[in-house]
Curated annotation (Swiss-Prot):
<keyword id="KW-0227">DNA damage</keyword>
<dbReference type="GO" id="GO:0003677">
    <property type="term" value="F:DNA binding"/>
</dbReference>
<dbReference type="InterPro" id="IPR003180">
    <property type="entry name" value="MPG"/>
</dbReference>
<keyword id="KW-0378">Hydrolase</keyword>
<dbReference type="GO" id="GO:0006284">
    <property type="term" value="P:base-excision repair"/>
</dbReference>
<comment type="similarity">
    <text>Belongs to the DNA glycosylase MPG family.</text>
</comment>
<dbReference type="Pfam" id="PF02245">
    <property type="entry name" value="Pur_DNA_glyco"/>
</dbReference>
<dbReference type="InterPro" id="IPR036995">
    <property type="entry name" value="MPG_sf"/>
</dbReference>
<dbReference type="InterPro" id="IPR011034">
    <property type="entry name" value="Formyl_transferase-like_C_sf"/>
</dbReference>
<dbReference type="GO" id="GO:0003905">
    <property type="term" value="F:alkylbase DNA N-glycosylase activity"/>
</dbReference>
<protein>
    <recommendedName>
        <fullName>Putative 3-methyladenine DNA glycosylase</fullName>
        <ecNumber>3.2.2.-</ecNumber>
    </recommendedName>
</protein>
<keyword id="KW-0234">DNA repair</keyword>
Length: 201
């Protein structure tokens, strides 16, 4: 997977429902160390924004959700069920709680060192399903609360890159309702790459 233009904070200074579909096809780069860098394509996203009852900041600002308020271009990582981490990209202007949840990634290949993060199974799992879900991708890429509030910038533990021109030509995105929530279920704020095996559901 070739390197593309790094996404700057200014590109993210928009409401999450605008940014989320445009992140489909972009690259998430995870730098664990100088020798361990993994690149994967974002294939599924969800938006959470002000006025949305499913948004963590719907009622008020708290120590847990304060990262959601910006600035744009940082990561918001939270823990659910006491065991699964979820990675979000903070968007919009500073002070507005707006994020894009990264729901699934597509890996082109899996380096040998990455298999150590994959639970042992009777049969080798499909590469397309390794990051098919927010909890799965965080476990695979070693993303946890230590990365909450970290800057998404080249050379940092994580950053984002724009879609490649070739990917852009054949891009087909499906828009639908979000999953795994009980409020705001009518909002069409989930997007995923059509006909992609790496999508969570």
């Amino acid at each position: 997977m070739a390197n593309n233009e790094v996404i700057e904070n200014t590109w993210l200074e928009r409401p999450s429902p605008e940014v989320a579909p445009e992140l489909i096809g972009c690259t998430l780069v995870r730098r664990i160390s100088e020798e361990k860098i993994i690149r994967s394509t974002i294939v599924e996203t969800e938006a959470y924004a002000p006025g949305d009852p499913a948004c963590h900041a719907y009622r008020k600002r708290t120590p847990r959700n304060t990262v959601m308020f910006g600035p744009p271009g940082i990561s918001y990582v939270f823990l659910i069920y006491g065991m699964y981490h979820c990675l979000n990209v903070v968007t919009d202007i500073d002070g507005i709680p707006s994020v894009v949840l990264i729901r699934a990634l597509q890996l082109e290949s899996v380096p040998n060192w990455l298999w150590e993060h994959i639970p042992k199974q009777k049969s080798k799992p499909k590469v397309s399903r390794l990051a098919a879900g927010p909890g799965k991708l965080c476990r695979l890429l070693n993303i946890d609360l230590n990365l909450n509030g970290s800057r998404l910038r080249a050379g940092q533990p994580m950053w984002l890159e724009q879609r490649s021109p070739s990917f852009e030509k054949n891009l087909q995105i499906v828009q639908t309702t979000r999953i795994g929530i009980t409020k705001g279920t009518n909002l069409l704020w989930r997007w995923y790459l059509a006909n992609c095996d790496a999508v969570s559901k």
